[in-house]
Design a protein with these regions (language model features):
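Basic, polyanion-interacting recognition surfaces, primarily
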Residues: 2-128
């Protein structure tokens, strides 16, 4: 998938700069005082930002488009475009593009239940 230049999340700290094309960004998970960025090709990049700081960067840089990225609990930010399967009972969330990436993540029943309800509401509002 081709990404336009403006559709990039810039993460800059000290002498380090990371450019992540948004269409390739599947999820970001907390890892102690760091965050791990996971892209469609399975590449994981550890950055010296806490998840809350990454969340703030997303909101600052993307504005209204930041709604595609959802914070799930304390340890996860997902790109909602990749939501493929939610199983509340098994506490499982699958993020996939239906082709080259497949990630199974765990989340609480409460978080997944809210996510499922939100997606259903979004879907129903789009039909109207």
């Amino acid at each position: 998938m081709y990404c336009k230049m403006k559709e990039v999340l810039l993460i800059s700290k000290g002498a380090e700069l990371i450019r992540v094309p948004l269409c390739n960004l599947v999820f970001i998970q907390a890892s102690a005082n760091y965050s791990e960025i996971v892209t469609v090709n399975g590449k994981k990049t550890l950055v010296s930002f806490q998840l809350g700081q990454i969340e703030d960067l997303i909101e600052e840089q993307l504005g209204e488009s930041s709604g595609d990225f959802l914070r799930l609990g304390r340890g996860l930010i997902i790109n909602s475009s990749y939501i493929f399967h939610i199983d509340v009972t098994r506490q499982k969330l699958v993020l996939s593009d239906g082709d080259r990436c497949w990630f199974e993540l765990s989340a609480s029943k409460e978080v997944l239940g809210k996510l499922k309800t939100w997606i259903e509401a979004e879907h129903n509002s789009e039909k109207k």
